[in-house]
Structures are given as structure tokens and as C-alpha cells.
């Protein structure tokens, strides 16, 4: 008799169970991957926006500090100094007027500059069809003492005699390398010179890097008892701020040092900037009270274009004195190009969008930029701030 064969219990998974578990695992994997991709995309977008915000804050700090000091050293005698053509040389070579046109984004700026606290060159940074906005030119001394120009008693080829030289103290390195701007209504320009050695009680000896007897426009002997001496600072330790700012290639804000104290050529300040605009705050009160009564565009024909403010006329000089504030606006763009599905909630980009600067001032003064195409896949920020011209506000009314 054959014994019955015992049946073993089945172990493992059936084919159906395996397929079901694979489907569940695949769904979970897709869900986790989707969450991670969206999380990383959000993280990249947040980081990119934070970078733009930090760059905007830094730009606002740099320009606020520079503009607030505009006019330092010479604004108190604006009727003698505003609008004079600047003549400067370094190591015997002409620096101003510029020997050749500056590089982009300052290629459309003039080669001859007139002394003014702030000038706005409307559209001067634009290059071809690329709209980049305005160029800001800011001029101010940094001496920290002797902020009021002194009357000149007499001038020779290598000396300038003043009522006193108390403001010409050694810098932190113990050197007497003060920069002096000689200005006179009757001269063809104002001449930058440099002190050489410790001055006597009333006389400055001229020499060093920024000394030249005869410049491109005027010579030392063009000045005399009717002239003014403006102390601007020193060339190394505390150089004056005669600087242009404009948006150039690669969405970068550049600066250009007119006197070439430290840098030559265009120097990047911050990236992520695609456009810069500015307006003048003008005091129209008679007598002047130091408060901006209206905002004025630097457009041609307004009386406040760069060309009209630097034509050397008494009217231009008076208008420069009326400028007591500057309002600056930037359009910032992130460096990250996002997918349309991540950038827009509906998953599809609109045909265009607009960004507006100075929108509260109305259509006559506001600036609008239209974004289309791939530009819609970036994120943008607009930054605006107003800076008072302290040295001009405190200057005499006449």
C-alpha cells in the first residue's frame, strides 16, 4: 500500500502580488521624485531671488553713500565752481578731458566733464536695441576737513598761497598728498593739482602725481587772486569720488573712476541689474528752502538734461543749485531661468508682462519695461530709493 504524499505549504509571492507591489513602489518613487524636484526648484528660485535682493541692497548702499557726499568740498561756493570744465592729468598724461571715449557702458558719455554734484545721462547706457537706462555721474570730495573752498591770494607755477592751510593735515600714512581743484569764473576750466610736501602756514607747494603746470584746457598761471581752491582729499588714502555708474553687458552695474585714482576702465559693482533710471528732485521755492518740490526727468528739452545742465551758462549753474535730491530706480533680474510650469501657476507663460519704475509719479515720469519671450522665465525685482544732496541743500542760495 502506497503512503499518501504530504503536500508542502507554498512559500513566496505570487506573480500578481509581485506586480501589485512593483506598481505601488513605482507610484511612491514618482511621488517622492516629484516632491524632491519641486523642492529643489523652489530652493533654486528662492536662492536666486535672495541673491538679487542682496545685490539690490548693496547697490542701494553704494549709491546712497556716494550721492549723499556729492558736492562735498565745493558746493558752498557753487556760483564759482558749478559747471566748470575739469582739467586733470596723472603722471603727465591727460585724464580729463578723456583722451578717448570710455568703454561700454559709458561709450556715449562726453569726453569733457563739467563739475556738478550729480548728473543723469538719460539713456546713455543703451547699446543698440539693448535698453539699459541712464548713466549717473557723481562728483564729491572726501577731505573730511576744509569743506569750504578758500580764496586764493596768489599763484605761481608751483605754489598756491591761501589765507591759511589749517585744513591740509597729513593723512593716516603721514603724507601730504592733498588734491586741490583750482576754479575761477574767468578761466576756461578748473584745474586739478596736488600738494607736494608739508605746506607752510599759508602756502601750498605743488607737485606729485597729479601735478601739471599746463593742462589740456588751462594752466596753473590761469588762476590768481579771484580764484578758489577746493580741497578734494588725497590720491591714495582718501580719494575723491568722481565716478560714473551705468548698466553694461551681462546684466552688470559698472562704475568708472574719472580721475583714475585707484581703478582704470569699467569696474563691475554688482550683477543682476538690467536697467537703471533716475530723476532729479528740484527745489522750485524762492528763496530756496532745500526741499524738493517736484521731480524732473533728465529728458532733452526739460532744462535738466545732461547737455542742458553742462552748457556752461549761468542758467545751467542755477538749475544745478536747485537739484537737492535724486531718486534712483533699478530693475533686477535673477540669474536662474525657470521652467514655465515652475514659474507660472497655470503652467503656461503669458505673452508679456510689464515692470514699472516711479509708478507713483504718473505717466510723464514713470518708466515701463515690457518683458517678452524667454525673459518671462526669470524673476524680477524693482528697487527705488531717494537720496538727498546734503551739501547742496546746505549751500548758500546765491
What role is predicted for each listed range?
Residues 382-398:
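Structural signal for terminal/edge beta-strands and the immediately following C-terminal loop/tail
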Residues 59-325, 329, 335-379, 396-398:
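N-terminal pilin/flagellin-like segments and related low-complexity appendage regions
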Residues 4-5, 11-64, 68-70, 398:
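Aliphatic-rich helix starts adjacent to a transmembrane/signal segment
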Amino acid at each position: 500500500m502506497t503512503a499518501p504524499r504530504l503536500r508542502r505549504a507554498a512559500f513566496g509571492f505570487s506573480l500578481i502580488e509581485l506586480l501589485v507591489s512593483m506598481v505601488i513602489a513605482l507610484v511612491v518613487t514618482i511621488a517622492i521624485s516629484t516632491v524632491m524636484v519641486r523642492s529643489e526648484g523652489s530652493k533654486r528660485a528662492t536662492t536666486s531671488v535672495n541673491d538679487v535682493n542682496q545685490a539690490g541692497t548693496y547697490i542701494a548702499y553704494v549709491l546712497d553713500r556716494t550721492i549723499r557726499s556729492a558736492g562735498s568740498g565745493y558746493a558752498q561756493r557753487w556760483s564759482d565752481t558749478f559747471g566748470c570744465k575739469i582739467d586733470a592729468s596723472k603722471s603727465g598724461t591727460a585724464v580729463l578731458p578723456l583722451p578717448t571715449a570710455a568703454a561700454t557702458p559709458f561709450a556715449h558719455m562726453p569726453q569733457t566733464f563739467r563739475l556738478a554734484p550729480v548728473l543723469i545721462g538719460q539713456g546713455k547706457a543703451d547699446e543698440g536695441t539693448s535698453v539699459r537706462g541712464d548713466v549717473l555721474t557723481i562728483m564729491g570730495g572726501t577731505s573730511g576737513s576744509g569743506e569750504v573752498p578758500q580764496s586764493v591770494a596768489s599763484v605761481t607755477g608751483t605754489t598756491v598761497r591761501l589765507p591759511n592751510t589749517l585744513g591740509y593735515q597729513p593723512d593716516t600714512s603721514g603724507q601730504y598728498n592733498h588734491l586741490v581743484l583750482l576754479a575761477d569764473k574767468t578761466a576756461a576750466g578748473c584745474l586739478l593739482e596736488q600738494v607736494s610736501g608739508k605746506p607752510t602756514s599759508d602756502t601750498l607747494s605743488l607737485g606729485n602725481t597729479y601735478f601739471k603746470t599746463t593742462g589740456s584746457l588751462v594752466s596753473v598761471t590761469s588762476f590768481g587772486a579771484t580764484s578758489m581752491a577746493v580741497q578734494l582729499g588725497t590720491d591714495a588714502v582718501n580719494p575723491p569720488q568722481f565716478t560714473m555708474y551705468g548698466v553694461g553687458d551681462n546684466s552688470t552695474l559698472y562704475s568708472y573712476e574719472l580721475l583714475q585714482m585707484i581703478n582704470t576702465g569699467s569696474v563691475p559693482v554688482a550683477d543682476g541689474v538690467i536697467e537703471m533710471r533716475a530723476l532729479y528732485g528740484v527745489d522750485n521755492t524762492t528763496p530756496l528752502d532745500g526741499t524738493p518740490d517736484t521731480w524732473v526727468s533728465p529728458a532733452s528739452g526739460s532744462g535738466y538734461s545732461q547737455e542742458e545742465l553742462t552748457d556752461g551758462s549761468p542758467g545751467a549753474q542755477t538749475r544745478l543749485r536747485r537739484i537737492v535730491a535724486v531718486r534712483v530706480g533699478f530693475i533686477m533680474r535673477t540669474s536662474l531661468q525657470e521652467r514655465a510650469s515652475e514659474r507660472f501657476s497655470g503652467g503656461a507663460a503669458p505673452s508679456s508682462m510689464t515692470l514699472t519704475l516711479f509708478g507713483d509719479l504718473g505717466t510723464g515720469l514713470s518708466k515701463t519695461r515690457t518683458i517678452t519671450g524667454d525673459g518671462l522665465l526669470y524673476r524680477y525685482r524693482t528697487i527705488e530709493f531717494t537720496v538727498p544732496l546734503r551739501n547742496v541743500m546746505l549751500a548758500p542760495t546765491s
